Amino acid sequence: MKINKKTIGGFLLIVFGISVFFGGGSFGFIIPLAIGSLMTYAGIKRFAAGKTITGIIVGGIGAIMLICSLPFVVGIALAAAMVYYGWKLMKNGSADNGVSSFDPEPASAAYQSHFDDEWEEFLKKK
């Protein structure tokens, strides 16, 4: 894999997304999210079946539970998006052929000094 700006950016997005997922989203919010979803679904089914009052009450309580879980859901979605786009950046960044990797380049003639040659000659004279 070639290391360039895209792969580094992708890696940082993945690391940040995983930290948001595990740091910001605890798994304790999954239970109210599931219960709220089931209650909202049951309320809609009751409302459609003609039981208007119980459908509104059950659906309303479920919606309130879902709204309270909304920051958790948004955080998880944001973390998943960061991991996905980070991975995509890393994969696309490593496919670039125009970017050189971190292979050492040979020194050009302008930067080569003849100090070693002169030092060897100096030592031979002594």
From Swiss-Prot:
<keyword id="KW-0812">Transmembrane</keyword>
<keyword id="KW-1003">Cell membrane</keyword>
<protein>
    <recommendedName>
        <fullName>Protein LiaI</fullName>
    </recommendedName>
</protein>
<keyword id="KW-1133">Transmembrane helix</keyword>
<feature type="transmembrane region" description="Helical">
    <location>
        <begin position="11"/>
        <end position="31"/>
    </location>
</feature>
<dbReference type="GO" id="GO:0005886">
    <property type="term" value="C:plasma membrane"/>
</dbReference>
<keyword id="KW-0472">Membrane</keyword>
<feature type="transmembrane region" description="Helical">
    <location>
        <begin position="56"/>
        <end position="76"/>
    </location>
</feature>
